[in-house]
Regions:
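His/Asp/Glu-enriched short active-site or ligand-binding loop at hydrolase and phosphoryl-transfer sites
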Residues: 194-206
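Non-catalytic positions within long, well-ordered alpha-helices that form the structural scaffold/packing
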Residues: 68, 163, 220-221
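Mid-to-C-terminal alpha-helical segments outside catalytic/metal-binding sites
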Residues: 8, 20, 25, 29, ...
Length: 267
C-alpha cells in the first residue's frame, strides 16, 4: 500500500486505503467452487438436439464447462430413449455425439465423453433390447428409467434377464418414483436382486419436491446410493447443484456418500 504520510490529503488517503482493504477482503473471501468427490458424471442430458436437454452445441459446451468447474472430467452422455417422445437410435445419438466431440476438441475443453443413454422401460425399449441395439456405458452398465406413474409390472423378470445377458443394471433416480416412497422395502428388494441405484444431486435440493428429497436422504442413511448423477438438462441445473455442494448439508452427507458411491469405478 502507498505511504499516506507522503500525501497532502490525509483524510482522503485514509478513506481510500480503507476502501482498498475492504474490497481486498471482499474478493479474497469469495469462496471457490467446491468440487465433487468424484470425477465422472453418469447421468446427464448434455448431448445436443436429441431430447429436452441441451438444444445446441453451444449450450452443451456451457454445460460441460459447468461440469468441469465442479471437478468432473468424464461425462457419460445419457440422452432419453423413450417411446413416441424420444425414439432415439444408435445412429441419431452417435451423430450428435461426434458433433459434440469435435466441438469440445475445437473449444479446448479437457473432458472425456462417453456415449450411452437413459432407457425408459417401455414398448420402444422392448424393441431395441430385443434387437440388441442398446448402447451400454463402459463395463456394460445400462441406465434404466421406470415410469413415474407406476412400477413396470415385469420389472424383476426384466432385470434378471438383463443381468443373465451380462448387463449391469442401474435404476435412474429411484427417489423420484413416489410410489416407492410409500413402500421403501421395495428399494431393498431391488437392490438385493442386483439393481444398482443412481440418485440425482438435484433431488437433495428439493428441486423435484419434498417427497423425492426425503427419499434421497433415506438412501443416504441406508447406505444404498451406488451412483450420483447431475441429470443436468440445462445450465440452470448446474448452478443449483453448484450452490448445493457449497452447503452445510452437503458437507455433512458427503463423507457418508464417499463410502458407497462408485462413479469413478464405472470407467
Amino acid at each position: 500500500m502507498r505511504d499516506c504520510k507522503k500525501r497532502t490529503n490525509f483524510a482522503g488517503c485514509f478513506v481510500v486505503d480503507n476502501l482498498i482493504i475492504m474490497f481486498g477482503k471482499l474478493f479474497k473471501s469469495k469462496k471457490e467452487q467446491v468440487k465433487l468427490f468424484y470425477n465422472t458424471d453418469v447421468h446427464c442430458h448434455i448431448l445436443p438436439g436429441v431430447d429436452h436437454g441441451s438444444q445446441s452445441v453451444e449450450q452443451s459446451l456451457e454445460m460441460l464447462k459447468a461440469e468441469a468447474e465442479m471437478g468432473i472430467h468424464r461425462v457419460i452422455l445419457t440422452s432419453h430413449v423413450t417411446a413416441v417422445t424420444f425414439e432415439n437410435t444408435r445412429e441419431t445419438l452417435m451423430d450428435a455425439f461426434m458433433k459434440l466431440k469435435d466441438a469440445v476438441a475445437d473449444a479446448g475443453i479437457d473432458m472425456e465423453l462417453y456415449l450411452s443413454a437413459e432407457y425408459r422401460m417401455d414398448e420402444y425399449f422392448d424393441k431395441e433390447y430385443a434387437a440388441d441395439h442398446l448402447i451400454p456405458m463402459p463395463g456394460n452398465h445400462i441406465l434404466l428409467e421406470n415410469s413415474f406413474q407406476q412400477e413396470l409390472m415385469n420389472l424383476d423378470d426384466l432385470l434378471f434377464d438383463m443381468q443373465v445377458k451380462g448387463y449391469r443394471t442401474i435404476l435412474a433416480h429411484p427417489e423420484r418414483y413416489n410410489y416407492y416412497s410409500r413402500r421403501r422395502k421395495r428399494y431393498e428388494e431391488l437392490h438385493n436382486a442386483g439393481a444398482r441405484f443412481q440418485i440425482n444431486i438435484l433431488s437433495f435440493t428439493g428441486y423435484f419436491g419434498e417427497e423425492a428429497r426425503d427419499s434421497a436422504l433415506w438412501f443416504v442413511r441406508n447406505g444404498m446410493i451406488d451412483y450420483l448423477g447431475s441429470d443436468m438438462h440445462n445450465v440452470k441445473h448446474a448452478h443449483i447443484i453448484m450452490d448445493y455442494i457449497n452447503s452445510k448439508e452437503w458437507r455433512k452427507i458427503a463423507p457418508e456418500l464417499e463410502q458407497t458411491v462408485k462413479n469413478d469405478m464405472i470407467i
